[in-house]
Amino acid sequence: MYNPPSAQEMTYKDHVQRRHEEKGCLYACLFTLCCCFCCYETCECCLETLCCCC
């Protein structure tokens, strides 16, 4: 599997990409939607991920 980055934090986009690789497109899209729902806004990163995901 993947080891976490040692010197730097994982970005949101990296985290979603990792979910996509590990669990598939549907899981990554749901993960992204849940993130946007929790922060009560649709951020640019969420839209990018949803468009690129499926």
UniProtKB/Swiss-Prot annotation:
Cellular component terms per the entry's GO annotation: extracellular region; plant-type cell wall; plasma membrane
Key words of the record: Cell membrane, Cell wall, Membrane, Metal-binding, Secreted, Stress response, Transmembrane, Transmembrane helix
An example molecular function term from Gene Ontology annotations: metal ion binding
Presence of keyword Metal-binding: yes
Primary localization: membrane
GO BP field: cellular detoxification; detoxification of cadmium ion; detoxification of copper ion; response to cadmium ion
The keyword Transmembrane helix is annotated on this UniProt entry: yes
Regions that span the bilayer: 24-40
Tissue: Expressed in roots and shoots.
Signals that turn on the gene: Down-regulated in root tissues but up-regulated in shoot tissues in response to cadmium (CdCl(2)).
Cellular localization per UniProt: Cell membrane; Secreted, Cell wall
One Pfam family per UniProt: CYSTM
Protein origin, superkingdom: Eukaryota
Protein topology in the membrane: Single-pass membrane protein
Family, similarity comment: Belongs to the CYSTM1 family.
Record function comment: Confers resistance to heavy metal ions (e.g. cadmium (CdCl(2)) and copper (CuCl(2))) by chelating them at the plasma membrane of root cells, thus stopping their entry and reducing their accumulation.
Protein name, as recorded: Protein CADMIUM TOLERANCE 5
Organism: Oryza sativa subsp. japonica
